[in-house]
């Protein structure tokens, strides 16, 4: 885990990273799993990087926003600092859908006063050398780039 390695270098044995991500996860799926995760780990910081799979499935942006808001609320209720990492989706569903999808992250971050990394795949998306054959998901070469993008947000939350 690159994040754990970076944290261990700067803060030896002070922070434990729990990667609770699930491949193909939607905001609804995460919402069902989050209460138990919060209870089990009692995290100081929760990074929410979800919604992309909802968007690829054409889920209503309002539903995605509602789920993101609930994920933030549940985390904040447990006294965790929340970071929201935004996503963008391919233009398959049209400009209006894409804009509504992307605005979800801004709205939720402003409403709940959480830090927003606007686009977690900035510098990765669209770069064929950093994306898997599905043209959506980042490959192993992209991971250090994504860590460098996310780390200032994570470090600031500690």
Q: Each predicted region: which residue ranges?
A:
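Serine-esterase "nucleophile elbow" of acetyl-processing enzymes
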Residues: 1-23, 33-42
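Structural recognition of the beta-strand scaffold that forms the well-ordered cores
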Residues: 16-21, 45-49, 82-86, 117-118
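Solvent-exposed loop/turn segments at secondary-structure junctions
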Residues: 22-28, 52-57, 63, 88-92, ...
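Alpha-helical scaffolding within the catalytic cores
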Residues: 28-40, 62, 66-70
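Glycine-rich phosphate-binding loop signature in dinucleotide/nucleotide-binding domains
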Residues: 39-42, 78, 157
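Active-site segments of SGNH/GDSL-like serine hydrolases
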Residues: 49, 69-103
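Catalytic His-Asp segment of secreted/periplasmic serine-dependent ester chemistry enzymes
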Residues: 88-158
């Amino acid at each position: 885990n690159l994040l754990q390695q970076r944290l261990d270098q700067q803060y030896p044995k002070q922070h434990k990273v729990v990667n609770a991500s699930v491949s193909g996860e939607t905001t609804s799926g995460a919402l069902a799993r989050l209460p138990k995760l919060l209870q089990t780990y009692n995290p100081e910081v929760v990074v929410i990087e979800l919604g992309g799979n909802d968007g690829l499935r054409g889920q209503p942006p309002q539903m995605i926003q509602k789920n993101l808001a609930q994920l933030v609320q549940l985390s904040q209720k447990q006294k965790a600092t929340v970071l929201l990492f935004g996503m963008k989706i391919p233009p398959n569903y049209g400009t209006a859908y894409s804009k509504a999808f992307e605005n979800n992250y801004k709205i939720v971050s402003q409403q709940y006063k959480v830090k927003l990394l606007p686009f977690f795949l900035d510098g990765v998306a669209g770069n064929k050398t950093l994306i898997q054959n599905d043209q959506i998901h980042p490959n192993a070469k992209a991971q250090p780039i994504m860590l460098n993008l996310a780390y200032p947000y994570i470090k600031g939350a500690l």
